A protein has these predicted regions:
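Small side chains
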Residues: 5, 11-13, 138, 194, ...
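Short secondary-structure boundary/hinge segments and terminal tails
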Residues: 44-45, 118, 295
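Short, contiguous, pocket-lining structural segments
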Residues: 184, 221-228, 264-268, 275
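N-terminal periplasmic/intermembrane-space "pro-region" immediately following the signal or transit peptide
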Residues: 2-64, 71-73, 413
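Exposed aromatic-hydrophobic patches
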Residues: 218
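Outer-membrane beta-barrel pore domains
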Residues: 82-83, 126-133, 144, 240-413
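Outer membrane beta-barrel
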Residues: 49-214, 223-241, 245, 250, ...
Length: 413
């Protein structure tokens, strides 16, 4: 049997009508024999969708295996304490999903993360419709997906410069626990992502969603039923090897549980997130500012608070021939909770924490090895994070230090 014939036999399980035509073509060109083609056909298994309207199905997968070593030391009330450290391997993400296209611009996407708990295993689940007219071009989404708030949050986790998201990003976007805000991340609702055909580089988006993230099928018991309204706008410019994008994201809800999903304090939140991105000659960087005006958000939920944060991140890729690319990466993050409070576990994933602080900062330095781009990537990084002050007194002489080493291997398919 020819080499091409053997390769075709190995892929027989994916045959369909188009593959039959391909086999006939290979026979007519003399690449394989008719007997070889018939043998491949006998061993093939047709995989077809249940509904006839489905035109194609695409498999989506991601596997991330991570090592983490996390050490936290707290200095509070005149004492120093080393908290229980972490030194383990974890399956960080195990995504498996599908995208089905039905024609006429309609599609549906469902992705599950088997590394999460059974209560929050959905990554995405939404229906989409492509729309294109003279003055209206974009895509409508209905379902569970990420809002456009906090650059690092809505950037795919497979494309992060760092292994985990930053102190400030996690504080603004992770689930509301009475300290974190829960503004970004995944919400159930209606989304529109559009562009202006007459103005190249100008994009925008709007969404109306539940105000609580990470709850795809219902809002938490006792939650306020008011919605969250979000919008974004950006302009991108590309000149040869240089591209730059500037934009701003906005979110507002007139009623969410600022005391956490189990709390009883419902109030309004307005959040803004201007940002800038730059790519030039191997350098890739971004920076954003996060700010939220929250009613009844601190001091036993009796006073307003204005948390704010800053992120700056960059990496530079060096080609190393057949071995891919190597990219040193750095990130700085700063957070001021304005008295709402933050624990180390709020900003550093899987860190242990006991004391609540006022503000904090972190520095990350690492190396990314793009063996086959993001499809096959290894990351190694160190992060130092420090929180200081007391929740109700930013000048209090107390702080917490975290030293974190992580390594992660990633495969996309």
């Amino acid at each position: 049997m020819t080499i091409l014939g053997a390769a075709a036999l190995c892929s027989a399980g994916a045959l369909n009508a188009q593959d039959r035509q391909t086999l006939d073509l290979l026979v007519s060109k003399g690449v394989i024999t008719r007997a070889e083609a018939d043998n491949i056909g006998k061993n093939s298994v047709a995989i077809t969708p249940k509904q006839k309207a489905v035109k194609s199905i695409k498999l989506i997968g991601r596997v991330q295996t991570q090592y983490e070593n996390i050490n936290v030391r707290e200095y509070a009330n005149g004492t120093s304490e080393s908290l229980t450290s972490k030194n383990d391997f974890i399956m960080r993400r195990m995504f498996l999903g599908m995208e089905a296209k039905l024609g006429a611009g309609w599609s549906a996407t469902v992705i599950a993360d088997f590394a999460r708990s059974s209560d929050n295993y959905l990554e995405y689940a939404y229906i989409s419709k492509d729309v294109e007219y003279d003055f209206l071009k974009g895509k409508l989404h209905l379902g569970y997906k990420k809002t456009t708030f906090a650059v690092e949050e809505y950037m795919s986790a497979s494309k992060l410069f760092t292994i985990e998201r930053s102190l400030a990003t996690r504080y603004f976007t992770e689930g509301n626990n009475g300290r974190r805000l829960g503004i970004g991340g995944r919400h159930t609702g209606v989304y529109w992502d559009g562009s202006i055909p007459q103005i190249e580089g100008l994009t925008y988006g709007v969404s109306v969603t539940n105000s609580y993230n990470n709850n795809p099928t219902s809002i938490p018991a006792g939650a306020d039923n008011n919605l969250m309204y979000s919008a974004n706008v950006a302009y991108a410019l590309k000149l040869d090897d240089v591209s730059i994008q500037a934009g701003a994201n906005f979110s507002y809800t007139n009623g969410t549980n600022v005391a956490g999903t189990a709390g009883t304090v419902h109030a309004e939140v307005l959040a803004v997130n201007p940002y800038i991105k730059l790519k030039a000659f191997g350098l890739d960087m971004w920076a954003d500012f996060l700010l939220a005006d929250m009613k009844d958000a601190k001091n036993a939920f009796s006073q307003n608070a204005t948390p704010m944060g800053v992120n700056v991140a960059a990496e530079y890729k060096f080609d190393i021939g057949e071995f891919g690319q190597i990219a040193p990466a750095v990130r700085y993050s700063w957070i001021d909770t304005d008295g709402r409070g933050i624990k180390m576990s709020d900003g550093v994933r899987n860190a242990n924490a006991e004391t609540t602080y006022y503000a904090g900062q972190s520095v990350y330095a690492g190396i990314n090895w793009y063996i086959k781009g993001n499809d096959l990537k290894f990351q190694l990084g160190y992060e130092w994070a420090q929180l200081n002050g007391a929740a109700n007194n930013k000048h209090a002489a107390q702080h917490s230090d975290a030293n974190v080493v992580r390594a992660q291997m990633q495969v996309l398919f």
